[in-house]
Amino acid sequence: MYQRILWKFALTAIVLLWATLNLIPFKETEFKDYLRQEATAQRDELLKLIDRAAQRVQEKKAASVFVALKQIGHEERIDMSKFFPEVRLESSLRNIEKRNDILFEYLLKESKPRLQLGLDLKGGVAFTLEASSLEVAGQQQTVHELKLDKAVEIIGTRVNALGVAEPIIRPVGTNRIEVQLPGVSTKDNPEVISVLRKPAVLTFHLVHPQYAFMPEPLPLAALPPGYVNMSTDSDDASGRPVTTYCAVKRIPEMDGENIVDSRPTVDMYGGYEILLRFNDVGAKKFADVTGANVGRLLGIVLDGKLYSAPRINDRIGGGSAQITGRFTQREALELSNVLNNPLKVKLDVVEQYEVGKSLGEDAIMSAKTAFLISTALTILFILVFYTFGGVIAAVGMGCNVFVILGVMAMPGVEATLTMPGIAGIVLTLAMSVDANILIFERMKEELATGKSLTAALEAGFEKAWSAILDSNVTTLLTAIIMWALGKGAVKGFGVTLTIGIFTTMFAAMIVSKLLLQVAILPGYMKRLPMFSVLQNTRYDFLKFGRAAFIASWTIVFIGVGVVAFKGKGIFGIDFVGGDQVTIAFQQPIDVGQLRSAATQGTGVREATFAYQTQLGSGTQVLKCTTEFEKGGVVVEAIQKAFPQAGFTNAGVNSIGPSVGSEILKSALISVALALLGIMLYVAFRFEFGYGMGAVIATIHDLLMTIGIFVLFDRQFNASMVAAILLIIGYSINDTIVVFDRIREELAGNPEGSLRDILNRALNLTLARTVITGGTTLLTSITLIVVTTGDVNDIAFTLLIGVLTGTFSSLFIACPVFYWWHKGDRRHVEAHRDIAPKYEWEGASKASN
């Protein structure tokens, strides 16, 4: 017996330990304290250096201990890695400054919690970039010709490549871009801005054969006509940086316009270089340039800096080239990133702030309370129906959320936790209880036939397995499509949903089964009390199918009509932009209180506040983002509500959307392909009529949810993209459970008519439908009552989705399946082999 559960126990322990290791450390340690903890060699010397660095910060000679230590190491050529011998650096890296950079970045990252908080919970850094014309290959190009929107898209791609999740990037006015990065501090990472604003203009120049790698630049009078001085850096044998100079032809032989890919690679000496790959046009140009200049040095210049000048030994016709230089791994990755996403405008930093969290303490506390209450209500709800089984479901929920957080924190994922993200996890947990409910309801049916508790346990898991598998696979198809094709929030939702599917399966089929087996198999538990509800019902659901179908689609068309009538009015600031007001103040007020004052009785539907501290001067201002032409209204409202604060309007800017059209487009494409994937999978696993029913029901639920959301005069913002997509998962999950039971009843009941089979399947799954919906409704209603803002909108969306999903499973999906087959089970059997299977023919053994 114990051998049957030993592997489950071992797997559970390994997964939970792995999740724990991913989440450690749980709290941030101040950098200087972390260095004291981790240093294992020459500690006394390091402690003195830390004290000196702290003194520099106190004297305002450095922004942080992190920066001060790097300065000291550079000035005095101290290799800081000697204090941390356990940290392995690149073996080929001899330059002390770069070794210290890599070491300190690693230690800084290790000092922070694995799971980072978003802008709403912790804040971050914000800066404004101003675009101006840029000279490329001798031609002046203007900002208007190149469009600011493209620059916003490119910066977004670069931010994603840096591993920063949930950023805000949007145009401000006609020539500025605002970037907000959660969990980032320019005090510790000042290079982040330069990486994002680097144009990445790559050009190839011939080097004068007589004036290459000189110790000093040529005097201007001695420069050959058409040539300019450029410097390049290298290291000598001791690791000291050495600068040499080349006379480089001013006009490039070709540029990097035709590069289709760049990526870092390791050379034969263990150093890093960048491999470039050209398209056909670029490959021909490069072959022509190298073929015509065999024996010459070809300088590779990026943003006016000469990185390398290799000699052309032969014509290069392979369509690729390498940039060699003194690259660290990080530098190679960053350069590859910017080369893959080149900017064609010059970006200058005009403002730089540390940003406070956008949610006030009161809002955060009320949201935390709501999450705790909703989770407690969900557990209580399950305990009422399943007693000890509810305890097991609650333990499974705990394991589920712990593993989800562990996956989010793992290297390579490193997701940022925001308040809407927490709401999504809480709601996902409420929905994930469905697997346990399916198992318990099946066990209840088996116990009613007189089976022992042990036999009911095995049969319950076996019979629930197909429904759990198919419902999760269809949802997984949706998630993978969003992950692969989506952008921004859509891609992020696809990743999160994929994680949730696997953790839910693990919690239900491994953890819950393990706990039940430990309690039942040794005989500790003789009975499993479960409260029965909606048992032996005989409702004729198909009787109301036509009327329900017409009524619900009428509501859908009304909702779609309202959406069409309102047009862009259904979108919030994230999608259409708005006003950004800079407000000076004398006394800070909690941003939650400011939001309430700005939106109550003023006609303002949306207002977001955040305190920002300008780096350098330390000046603090309040930034408010609201709808177009509402900035003045907001300022008047908060001035009236808080006269003691001394609020004054310091300026208003128009801001663009933070969610680009590409994200909306990717969401629509992902949904369309997901629906096609669902139909094909269901048709393969069941039959085509099932696929039609599932897709039509899902479309119904999406349109109904959007329509009702708009009818209640709510607006769509970035977090709502994920909430709407979540409805697809819930809707198809509900429908598949019903279809799985229909398939089973058709196979086991050869005499019943198709109408009787459908009604029987709907009645048999009714208790599960109501209990699953009830757990999610409890969570949604609690969040709606207690929270505000995006969390409230997400909860409201799921409330509608649960109600419409339950309705469509009963009155849309099944009637469509019934009408598709013209009410004749022979039509079903002609399209799918569902020959009856009887118990005496040998059912498969329950899996371990």
For each of these PLM feature ranges, what is it?
Residues 118, 129-135, 142, 149, ...:
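Extracytoplasmic
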Residues 1-16, 22-111, 506, 510-561, ...:
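Interfacial helix-loop-helix hairpins and adjacent transmembrane helices
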Residues 2-4, 275, 281-300, 361-417, ...:
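Interfacial segments of transmembrane alpha-helices in multi-pass membrane proteins
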Residues 430-471, 517-524, 714-771, 812, ...:
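Cytosolic juxtamembrane regions of multi-pass inner-membrane proteins
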Residues 12, 399, 406-409, 445-555, ...:
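Hydrophobic alpha-helical transmembrane segments of membrane transport and translocation systems
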Residues 155, 358-378, 397-398, 431, ...:
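Pore- and gate-forming transmembrane helices of large, multi-pass membrane proteins
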Residues 12-19, 391-412, 422-432, 493-508, ...:
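Small-residue-enriched core segments of transmembrane alpha-helices in multipass membrane transport
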Residues 18-31, 38-312, 661, 681:
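Non-transmembrane, solvent-exposed regions of membrane trafficking/translocation machinery
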